[in-house]
Structures are given as C-alpha cells and as structure tokens.
Amino acid sequence: VKQSPTLPLATAVTLPASVDNPHYRQIGGEQAVRRLVERFYQLMDELPEARAIRAMHPPDLAPAKEKLFLFLSGWLGGPPLYAERHGPPRLRQKHLPFPIDTAARDAWMACMNRALEEQVSNADLRAQLAASFFKTADFLRNQP
C-alpha cells in the first residue's frame, strides 16, 4: 500500500519561488524587506481602516516589526531567520488569540498592498506577492 505524502501545514502559506531567483532577491534583499515592513507598520498607524488591527498590537511596534522582518526573510526565499531564532512560525497558532475576521484581513491587506505599491516597483512581482499575502491573511482568519 502506497501512502501519499502528507504536506505540512506551512505549505498553505509558503510562497512559491524559483530556487535560482527567489522573491527575496527579486524584491531587493534584506534592506528592501526591512523597508517594506517599516512602511507596512507606518500605514497601520496612519490608515483609519487599520485602527482595529493596530489595536491588536502593543504601543511599541519594534518587536512586531522585527518578527515580521524575520518571518518575511524566509517566506520570500531568503535566510530563514525567524525559524533560526524562534522555531517554526506556527502562524495560525500565534494569531488565534486575536479576532481575525474578514474586516481585519482586509485592513491588514490594505496596509500591505499599499506598502507593496510604494516599495516594489516590479508590477508582476508585486501582484505575485499580493496574491500570496492574501492567501496567508485569509488562512489566518478565525472568524467570519
């Protein structure tokens, strides 16, 4: 009896990338990922539609910024910094304490889409990243 391989849960949120040209390199490496994260959190502070998700974070966003940077580094095909420092991301488990509904997902995406528009000049890459971010954000919903 041949068993089919079981895919890990992380597959649901893994960004497909070419081994020879990962999204991490296409986006511009470490500094570009840091700029994207910084702009994302600036927008979370600025956009009225992001108030509810901003309220889910502590006043000091520095730890959240660093963790998102570490996660995105590996998720985009760069160094797996988050896993090296904190172990497996376990995104769903870590987000379960927060009420993430469609509105929260859409607010998060509004911040990320705008950050992508401002920070990623390649339209095809931007569209690929936006689609993958949406899948991940929707995967984290724990309420309708």
Residue ranges and their predicted role:
Residues 125-144:
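Preference for long, well-ordered alpha-helical segments
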Residues 109-111, 122, 139-141:
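Mature-region segments of soluble proteins
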Residues 5-21, 34-117, 130:
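Heme-based O2/NO sensor domains and their adjacent alpha-helical segments
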